């Protein structure tokens, strides 16, 4: 028998120019010594118990690694504070920044205009503030006092003893997490987790009223958004579920259900929160300026190291355009600088072909460019788009765009000081970002809320102490919105969010009727086989899965009583794809081909054609390729899932390849099979495929094989 190997991707050319395409993938070496490109997806999960208590030592491992860098940061801060000649230092710093080059200068895909914009916005120059009259400062705010019951005041002016206590518990690895759950719908619950400094501290669930009227908004926002009268009836059911976590400044991971309606609804709410936060921050500073004028010896701690306070991370320019447009709409400001430029660079009125699935058409509509960093500055009367990053209140970016600034190949040109004082971070459409390069998101978290390396005209007499003490991460609010919760999403919430106010996440109870296996539209044998991990750790899971594949699945392919050809092997992880491909090439005589997200058009076309003709018996197919292309692969008679798809829609789309073959008379549904390999760590994906109750049985039941039809 002639053996066919993979098509052209056996070796990765290390000499290629390191452009934007390379930055979308991560290189690492596996046991077979071959370079591997894959999204780096750590695994984590959170139990849904009514009340649980555990000590999360794993989440604190990074604390010890940061001790050395903290000492250096404090040293740099003391040097700045003791500087006798700040004018000379500032002139020298500006001279250096005039020579700053775009971090993406090695990327030949970026236009000169894009490079110039990034370069210009990184140069820290003194901003021109609008002169503020006394009437402007008090206009519309006569009924707005600094109320301690306002979450904005109570959260950011929290007693330092509470912050110091929790900070020390993190450092000493003595934190304790306590959780509780409330039901917000027949099939949806909200789970609240709070990190405490010790077991003796009391735990109680925060209030969940579901009313916007419970939270004070700036008067100009009420007027612009018709909220002067009743504010309760204006909220949708989805908004009532998340309004309290958002406006109480708690972290939130929310899994929504509808691509169009739900995204629009949660954006309406968080944009209102963003504007309220920015307006209150700026008004507080301006009022304190007046107080200082009459009382020069007064102490007013109301600032961070730098001006930017909000960071919104989005996958594409189209999503960013929708977000910024909503910010403009709800701001109550009529003057918007460079609005036409925003439309020219971010908006495209295009849609993918109607033959593609609805989710694909939504994800890839409009401008799908994933490189952008946009500064937005607010004054009393105007919004200034494309503002200098250090003079911006809001920064909207893609992971790739910010990565090229934070991780410049020239270490001297790297910058992250503009992220030092972020108090509100929002990740929109995490499900799409995960299919880009999720490691860029981890890079952003690593650079957040660090003590800046330079002064940036900071008035240290007004910097809050928890900034000076490098405790800003404990006050930062992080909001994450995703279509499907994955281990990556849980890892971000549990491992990267340390909000002293605690964190919320929702959980949907998937019924049998809502599961993927019930929505196929035809009957076919679906076999789920569990990999026994024993007492193995999460790190060892890929090895156990691979051994199961080579010892159980491969023999079933060679000795199958069903079809010998038309076998589609679906592999979600690119590292697993490389490993399986090498094994089939070196250790078996199976005729196979492979297509992945790095295959060129010619290879994609020829390999699919050979598979349809039966000249290739097995076709290796990656999840990222399916996400970006949604091919209609012909000639599929059986499907093997190396791991359950993270997106349940992918399960149905791939299995329906068999249904289309049966419709054309190329296969018999009584002979065709679908085989899915899973472990107990795949519970999140299994829930959406087989339902919540069945997933619990599959992951913890006595049997290791379950069949559906």
From Swiss-Prot:
Name the domain of life: Eukaryota
Q: What GO terms fall under cellular component here?
A: nucleolus; small-subunit processome
State a single Pfam family of this protein.
Answer: UTP25_NTPase-like
Q: Which residues form a coiled coil?
A: none
- Record's family? Belongs to the UTP25 family.
What job does this protein perform? DEAD-box RNA helicase-like protein required for pre-18S rRNA processing, specifically at sites A0, A1, and A2.
Q: What is this protein called?
A: U3 small nucleolar RNA-associated protein 25
Source organism (scientific name): Zygosaccharomyces rouxii (strain ATCC 2623 / CBS 732 / NBRC 1130 / NCYC 568 / NRRL Y-229)
- Gene symbol? UTP25
